[in-house]
Amino acid sequence: MDYIENQGAYGTPTASIDWCELNYTYSPYIAEFYNTFSSLIISLFGIYGIWIMMPNFGTGVEKEHIKILKQLDVRNKVILSYISLIVVGVGSAFYHATLLYQNQLFDELPMIYTALIMLYIMVTVGEEKTKKGFKGGVLGNSLLRHLLPYLLIAYGLFVTITILVIQDQPKILQVSFGALVFYVVFHSIYLINKKKPDGMPSNPDSYLYKYAFVSMLVGFTCWVVERYFCKNGKTFGFQLHAFWHFFTGMSTYVWTQFLICKLLEAKHYCVGIKHTLGLPRIHAIKRF
């Protein structure tokens, strides 16, 4: 059930969804306090992801890793995915702070664009661009591969226009975003089970996938439970939508590390892994 305590500094909420948390409990300028600040945690995962891509990060192993990613033209793709994650967090914070429809779009549309970026990176794992087109990868040099960027852009535009035209219908985002996540999940399984290059030692791809998938699953469970069991601004005494923010932010960060792992593996690099406060980050070791 939705709760609107008062209008706050932004007037009557215009967003299509007003979440479980009671509005303007702590400040007339922040509609949903916990949901707003937990949104910024999403951005922090993106900021951390970019930080570990910087040339001055870490010791010799990390510096060599970043150098390799630049040589393989992977670093910029990774940074773009983390920038999009930062935008999702900022947009989500604006949405939950104001409960205005235009800020809801600032939250929802970057979610679609971030998923499309990750999908594109994932589909192009293992391919090389040649004078005759593309070599390797799941699509090879097929017509579909050449049309892929345009198809993804068209999907993003279609969803954007649909959401703008048909307002107050959150299921449009839920279905369109859910379809992208569904594909990413199962294409990841395909990449894990794909035959690895001869002589390649084990790498942490399966571990990273499980880490990201479980994080996403826990976050989604929090989202669903809150929608159905909200009572007096909480769900079983917790702000579960804030947990959704944390776990989905962490999942997206780790999934990007998974993609880096597969991109390196396709170029015959061994991959190592380190943790900071339980958060994994991978690094290239050497070619085999």
Swiss-Prot record:
Which top-level enzyme class is recorded in the Swiss-Prot or TrEMBL entry?
hydrolase
Induction record:
Up-regulated by srfA transcription factor.
- Where does the record place it? Membrane
In terms of InterPro entries, this protein maps to:
ACER
What are the transmembrane regions? 41-61, 78-98, 105-125, 146-166, 172-192, 206-226, 240-260
Glycoprotein: present as a keyword of the record?
A: yes
What's this protein's family per the entry? Belongs to the alkaline ceramidase family.
The name under which this protein is listed is Putative alkaline ceramidase dcd3A
Q: Which organism is it from?
A: Dictyostelium discoideum (Social amoeba)
The primary gene name is dcd3A
